[in-house]
């Protein structure tokens, strides 16, 4: 397993630790679905690119304060199956949180995660979860050192101009009567790097 050779700041690579199988490892929870449908993949990609374009064009009015300035340039994201597999293996462990090491031979990999739980007899759609990330823009001040990653880090990764690829995984399971939907998206190259701006202002 070549993933065991990939170096990260801490920990063992997710695919070295758990292998390449995306089989759910959720203890006594009842797994209802593991892995995104084609429609869910397309929805995630569409939502990301539409939002990136909105911000890049200077059409995002929200912020602290808004509006967000237009961007000089911003890549259009494409789906990457390797990033998606790493995300799916992690999601399949049913452990909410970031994994330690998910880089590929090509680049450092960033990550957004979301979990929605409901007592209703259905699972939250992926679109609601991605919207939670983009809605963090309301707390973001462009170019300020006061932004806290805990509050806006999902938004900043979503619109990180230099990121080119995305791949996601998910799991839907029932535990103690609650319907949990856990979504993991991996991004390459990673955003939220040091003091770099999320994008260059136009």
Swiss-Prot record:
Organism: Vespa velutina
Family named by the database record: Belongs to the CRISP family.
Name of this protein: Venom allergen 5
Pfam families tied to this protein: CAP (PF00188)
The keyword Nucleus appears for this protein: no
Classification via InterPro entries: Allrgn_V5/Tpx1_CS, CAP_dom, CAP_sf, CRISP-related, V5_allergen-like
Tissues showing expression: Expressed by the venom gland.
Function noted in UniProt: Does not show toxicity when intravenously injected into mice tail.
Alphabetical list of Gene3D superfamilies matching this protein: CAP
Residues with the Phosphotyrosine modification: 107
Carbohydrate-modified residues: 138
Assigned GO CC terms: extracellular region
SMART domains: SCP (SM00198)
Lineage: superkingdom: Eukaryota
Keywords (A to Z) from UniProt: Allergen, Disulfide bond, Glycation, Glycoprotein, Phosphoprotein, Secreted
Disulfide bond annotation, renumbered to this chain: 4-16, 8-101, 26-94, 168-185
Location(s), subcellular: Secreted
Keyword Phosphoprotein carried by entry: yes
